[in-house]
A protein has these predicted regions:
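Flexible glycine/proline-rich, aromatic-decorated loop/lid segments
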Residues: 51
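Conserved mixed alpha/beta core segments that line enzyme active sites in large multi-domain catalysts
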Residues: 20-48
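C-terminal interaction appendages of subunits in large macromolecular complexes
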Residues: 3, 10, 14-18, 26, ...
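Conserved glycine-centered short motifs in functionally critical loops
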Residues: 57-61
């Protein structure tokens, strides 16, 4: 049965490209999939700390994780700060990442819960919906909710409010209406004429999911072992992971550059001695004989010697008499070319590409020999992601807020007390 169009027509968003970048360059290990027919990566070579940015949640055998999402720009700023100063304190990191940042926005009440999660690996973040009391028409007021807490189902929330009003557990509600559209959330709770908006809103905070808490459990697999990580631990693990990815990518590119240069060195020698090469091929009984004769003969290298030495590869050696022996790979590459193409190749065409490869090989070797270069590459790639995708914080942090008391849930009324 063919897959539904919602699956076959799905496409990745632009940030996803930075989760998969260089996956084809031996940057991560692969393993068999569930039925052994395909290979799949054990981890994605993400260029930004995706576990913190997107968060994670799940339950396994004997353990659970619940990592909240964070602001991309804030997390990258903290990562860059740790790269610049590996001894940075957790308090300094919290200045960059003060609290989670939820895609649904809403208000984060206080920072103590987030701070505990960042310093100990577990904590609880209090989230409150963004709501205002507005006059919707003359002498009629309503509570207008424009942002709801993370992972709260809007339909369920509206049903709960309606049930509370119907059961008179929360008095003062005349009507609840969902006016949300593609531009955002808008839930309108119309109040009765004699209701006090602040009291009704406080009651809704207490009895509904307009106010909820997110329990942070920062459990992750670190080196294949489950570990409760602090903010410092997450960023340190990511930086170490990116070091490995960049080193493996550079080693792959070095290997490919050397493989190409090996072919080019053989072609350069062949072009320099093109008449003898063509004669050898034509006088051979079959390709196997031609390959053997190309490999056993010492070919004059002449002006190609400096380019061969420039490659800095032990597999390219010039004999003491200035000649060069072709390898089997080089001989096969020469034989794979049509004679017309071989005779048309110019020495400059080959040597120009060799010079370009030599510069790349030198740069790759420098990167692999220098941790500072690797860290510079990691920083630059993080800055590239930040420049393209960082957005302002959605969840506003209310650093100081008063605890809700019983008096906040009671309608204020004028009373007369008669004492006799």
């Amino acid at each position: 049965m063919p897959a539904a169009m919602r699956y076959t027509e799905v496409r990745m968003d632009k940030p996803a490209a930075f989760l998969l970048a260089d996956i084809d360059k031996d940057t991560v290990d692969f393993q068999d999939n569930y039925d052994g027919k395909d290979r799949e990566p054990t981890v994605l070579p993400a260029r930004f700390p995706n576990m913190l940015v997107n968060g994670a949640g799940g339950i396994a055998v004997g353990m659970a994780t619940n990592i909240p999402p964070h602001n991309l720009g804030e997390v990258i700023d903290a990562t860059l700060a740790m790269i610049d100063n590996p001894d940075i304190s957790i308090e300094e990191l919290i200045e960059f990442v003060p609290a989670p940042d939820f895609p649904t926005g809403a208000l984060i009440l206080g920072q103590s819960g987030a701070r505990k999660a960042y310093t100990e690996g577990r904590g609880s973040v209090l989230i409150r919906a963004r709501a205002t009391i507005e006059e919707i028409r003359k002498d009629r007021w309503a509570i207008v909710v424009t942002e709801i807490p993370y992972q709260v189902n809007k339909s369920t929330l509206i049903e709960t409010i309606a049930h509370l009003a119907r059961d008179k557990k929360v008095e003062g509600i005349a009507h609840v209406q969902d006016e949300s559209d593609r531009h955002g959330v808008r839930v309108v709770v119309e109040l009765k004429r004699d209701a006090t908006g602040e009291v009704v809103l406080n009651q809704l905070y207490k009895y509904t999911q307009l106010q909820t808490s997110f329990g942070c459990n920062m459990l992750a697999l670190n080196g294949g072992r489950p570990e409760v990580l602090t903010l410092h631990g997450f960023l340190s693990a990511f930086i170490g992971f990116r070091e490995e990815v960049v080193a493996r990518r550079t080693a792959y590119e070095l290997r490919k550059a050397r493989e190409r240069s090996h072919i080019l060195c053989g072609l350069a020698v062949a072009v320099t001695n093109v008449d003898e090469i063509v004669a050898t091929i034509r006088s051979s009984a079959d390709p196997a004989e031609a390959r053997e004769r190309l490999m056993t003969r010492r070919w004059p290298a002449g002006e190609i010697i400096p380019f061969i030495q420039l490659i800095d590869d032990p597999s390219h050696t010039v004999n003491d008499d200035g000649t060069y022996n072709l390898s089997e790979i080089q001989a096969r590459a020469i034989l794979d070319l049509r004679l017309q193409r071989l005779t048309a190749i110019g020495v400059k065409e080959v040597t120009d590409e060799l010079q370009d490869l030599a510069a790349k090989i030198k740069d790759y070797l420098d990167i692999l020999r220098s941790r500072a270069r690797i860290m510079e590459i990691i920083s630059n790639e993080l800055k590239e992601v930040r420049e393209q995708f960082a957005v302002p914080r959605r969840s506003e942090i209310i650093a100081h807020f008063g605890e809700m008391e019983d008096e906040d849930l009671i309608e204020r009324e004028d009373m007369v007390v008669t004492i006799t």
